[in-house]
Amino acid sequence: MSLLLTLIALLVSLLLFMARRRHGYWQRRGIPHDVPHPIYGNMKDWPKKRHIAMIFRDYYTKYKRSVYPFAGFYFFFTRSAVITDLELVKRVLIKDFNHFENRGIFYNEIDDPLSATLFSIEGQKWRHLRHKLTPTFTSGKMKNMFPIIVKVGEEMEKIFSAKTTTGEGQVLEIVDLVARYTADVIGNCAFGLNCNSLQNPNAEFVTIGKRAIIERRYGGLLDFLIFGFPKLSRRLRLKLNVQDVEDFYTSIVRNTIDYRLRTNEKRHDFMDSLIEMYEKEQAGNTEDGLSFNEILAQAFIFFVAGFETSSTTMGFALYELALDQDIQDQLRAEINNVLSKHNNEFTYEGIKEMKYLEQVVMETLRKYPVLAHLTRMTQTDFSPEDPKYFIAKGTTVVIPALGIHYDPEIYPEPEKFKPERFTDEAIAARPSCTWLPFGEGPRNCIGLRFGLMQACVGLAYLIRGYKFSVSTETQIPMKFVVKSILLSAENGIHLKVEKLSK
């Protein structure tokens, strides 16, 4: 018994020594950092007390005037460098991208094919896949998908019309309604499905989609292992996604491919582009083609990323417009003016002409970047001419987008909603890499133009026909779901919606 206790004591002592050794890295280098918790590192307040984006935002604010271009941080036992210098941000994302190509997050293409997305995969596989998928999001492809978005926008307008009356305000939870719009758009464009979630809030496509975002296969310690030690988790053959979620999307993609190949149907959407690459792979052209599992993963991330980010952005935009009626009126005037030039019809060219609408969306994404921090893994020692910029191989680099977006030296009065920050002149006057809701550089979001187009069309339909204002149920100031990685409103966004007379 005494021997067992001795062994346990030795093991605990060894673990504590290793933890202290890991947590002493930044101190040994003389890099400024907060004192880490013995177990949680600098993550003690997440996910129960503070949103992870707020932790990084405060870190940026605290250390931005340091003589070093980054501050030390510990994600449990993993060392990270939180970048506080814009020049280093630019080098990480663009100039010295070869040192920081990968995100260092979990994927397991063999056991968990849904996880092997363009967002997560690494190295040569990522480069090849990015090259193959880039033509899918050209202006021509966007224009081809535009009628699908407009059709769903019309359906959303009908739902709002049924829920409101002229001259009277009706309090509605906005995020759920616009999420059903984005689900139907992406269901059509990515899978060729009429999801009908606008008519049926409990449509399987949406409920499974929400589960794909929220639910994890294991939870607890294994989740910590997956997010903290992705390479080890891959060797242990762990999986991120719930089995019935994987089965659902696998079945949809398989049935969609089989149907379109059998009927030769062309819808000029995202799935058409993927099927073209699938046919090349089946014909033996692996250089230009995609396997079924590769198509499955990309269709999955297209839905998950577009569904959550666009609907959240639309919800936050309507929230800000409800708080400022002058901005809402100015936006409505622009929408009506442009539509009058296009026979009161929504056209691809007309949406491109709505510059103030674009500025509203961009300012929304400044205040509420859905993914409010970026991560990169240091592939090789980063040893520039100035030794204080040195970042060792294996260090996770964190770019605190929310901190940069709220830096008063970059955006004066950052708490205020000012769409004019995003005129061409204002953008040109700011340093680069100061607006990061879609990342920047070679690994930026490949679908950013689609996401912006989807949000702009949806907002144009709503602002044209409805007045949004705050109610007693509106949460002011905004509170976020602290346990989520993404920025999302706690308990939704409740606004008073009034139908406007035509």
UniProtKB/Swiss-Prot annotation:
Signal peptide: none
Cofactor: heme
InterPro entries: Cyt_P450, Cyt_P450_CS, Cyt_P450_E_grp-I, Cyt_P450_sf, Insect_CytP450_Detox
Topological category with respect to the lipid bilayer: Peripheral membrane protein
GO cellular component, one term: endoplasmic reticulum membrane
Entry EC number(s): 1.14.-.-
Pfam families linked to this entry: p450
The protein's name in its UniProt record: Probable cytochrome P450 6a23
Organism: Drosophila melanogaster
